[in-house]
Amino acid sequence: MFLRPTSIPSAVSQIRAQLFAGPSSLASQIQVRWASKAAGGKSKNGRESAGRRLGVKRYGDQYVTPGTIIVRQRGANFHPGQNVAVGKDFTIYALQPGYVKFYQHHLPYPHLSRPDQPGPQNVPSVKRPRQFRQFVGIARDREDKLPRDERAVGRERRFWGWPKEKVEVVPEAAVESAAGIQA
């Protein structure tokens, strides 16, 4: 009833010997062909896909509203500056209404440099030196320049939907007459 443990390996070895024995074995009948040329080609694959419509969508000094896409890109060629944000696919879009400004700076936004950390020295006179990153920002007025020196000028504050205080201009004659009445 019970097989001896030594009988199982011998049966397996007999089957193995029958399958792979001699020149007419199964292993010698398998044909192997080595590729001398790539079957489908390599350099011409993947050209049927449409372009992804990348690039700058709004140029310098163009007016944009919040949510307007300014740059579509792969990777961070342009970095977000003042009043813009970057999406998960590196799309740069507007957060505030205003005019698009492209500029270069050696520090990441908000560009706050310390006195003990001077800017790059001996910058070569080329269009885009390596020390500088390209930034996109939005200025409120077309004449404004970016980057703003936020320490000297202060941070730009915008209050959306908040009613503006109306300051009444009182003529000087009315002030003098009111002072004369009280006296």
UniProtKB/Swiss-Prot annotation:
GO terms under cellular component: mitochondrial large ribosomal subunit
Annotated organelle transit peptide span: 1-34
Subcellular location: Mitochondrion
Keyword Transport set for record: no
GO BP annotations, alphabetical order: translation
Pfam families: Ribosomal_L27
Major site of localization recorded for this protein: mitochondrion
Transcription regulation listed as a keyword: no
GO molecular function: structural constituent of ribosome
Keyword terms, alphabetized: Mitochondrion, Ribonucleoprotein, Ribosomal protein, Transit peptide
NCBIfam families per record: L27
Protein family according to the UniProt entry: Belongs to the bacterial ribosomal protein bL27 family.
Protein's recorded name: Large ribosomal subunit protein bL27m
Organism: Cryptococcus neoformans var. neoformans serotype D (strain JEC21 / ATCC MYA-565)
